[in-house]
From Swiss-Prot:
The gene is prmA. Belongs to the methyltransferase superfamily. PrmA family. GO terms for molecular function: protein-lysine N-methyltransferase activity. This is Ribosomal protein L11 methyltransferase. The keyword Cytoplasm applies. The keyword Transferase applies.
């Protein structure tokens, strides 16, 4: 099925007015995106307080209309609907409603991270190069959750875990994956030698995907997943958090408190230019061992002071 997509950029404080006008003209759905996404100005919006409506400074609204909608007629109607709204930058395009899971599976291929770690779509064969070695193979179907290995932040964390596994740091230990998404990092840690893992995410779809992927990999009894408010309070020898920099800063005390003395912590989801603020916040608790960058994204890793 096809739709006519109408996109317009506006100030966050005006978003509701634009959305109301689009809906009054028959919009089937309206989505909001950060106009500064994937830039140093990107700002995560998480769990606003009661009564708060927190939006980005500049918002892109995308509305879907029936494909047969007259674009020029719609534009004329929008421009005359409410004084003070600027529709000069509006864009129209036809989009096709696809089976996104199938599209993703068709495009997703096995990937290797570091020496031993392989991420393999659940419906594909294990690569030949993994068969003759002590490979850590994770069978994955991310579903609606983040984490397939294709994003640089995930890859940075997987290579870090692979190194810890090679150095024997994971052997027999426990791992906390904060912001677990599909469970990819927790599962990789288990395959690399960790005895037990805990995944935490504020998205119930992520917890479901993590459980299903744990079953798919035969480690369901060694992985527990929780919403943040329900997660057990304890310390772990290894903690990895692949979320946005603003959230890493906001949760610095909590995340650092989850790391056992002498334990390892990796922080990712940090855009170039944001790392100084993250380093400043965690310097209270950590001795920083290094930073690694890929495609403008950065991972910071350190050791918890005793």
């Amino acid at each position: 099925m096809a739709f006519l997509e109408v996109s317009v950029q506006c100030q966050g404080r005006s978003q509701a007015r634009y959305e109301e006008v689009l809906e009054s003209f028959g919009a089937l759905a309206v989505t909001l995106l950060d106009a500064d996404a994937d830039t140093v100005r990107e700002r995560g919006v998480f769990e606003p307080g009661v009564g708060e409506t927190v939006l980005w400074d500049v918002v892109v609204l995308s509305a879907l209309f029936p494909v047969e909608t007259d674009a020029l007629g719609l534009l004329a109607g929008l421009e005359g609907a409410e004084p003070g709204l600027d529709w000069g930058g509006v864009r129209f395009r036809v989009v096709v409603d696809e089976d996104w899971e199938r599209v993703w599976m068709d495009q997703f291929q096995p990937m290797r991270f570091g020496e031993r770690t392989f991420i393999v779509p659940w419906n594909q064969a294990v690569p030949v190069e993994a068969s003759g070695m002590d490979a850590a193979v994770v069978r994955l179907d991310p579903g609606l959750a983040f984490g397939s290995g294709t994003h640089p932040t995930t890859g940075l964390c997987l290579r870090w875990l692979d190194r810890l596994g090679g150095d024997g740091v994971l052997g027999g230990g426990e791992v906390l994956d904060f912001g677990c998404g599909s469970g990819i990092l927790a599962l990789a840690a288990l395959k690399l030698g960790a005895v037990y893992a805990v995944g935490v995410d504020n998205d119930p779809q992520a917890l479901l995907a993590s459980r299903e992927n744990a079953l798919r990999n035969g480690v369901a009894e060694r992985l527990e997943v929780y919403l943040p408010a329900e997660a057990p309070v304890r310390r772990y020898p290894v903690v990895v958090a692949n979320i946005l920099a603003s959230t890493l800063v906001a949760l610095a005390e909590r995340l650092a408190g989850c790391v056992a003395p002498g334990g390892r912590l990796a922080l990712s989801g940090i855009l170039r230019g944001e790392e100084k603020e993250v380093l400043r916040c965690y310097a209270v608790w950590l001795d920083v061992l290094g930073c690694e960058e890929e495609d403008g994204w950065i991972r910071i890793d350190g050791v918890r002071r005793c």
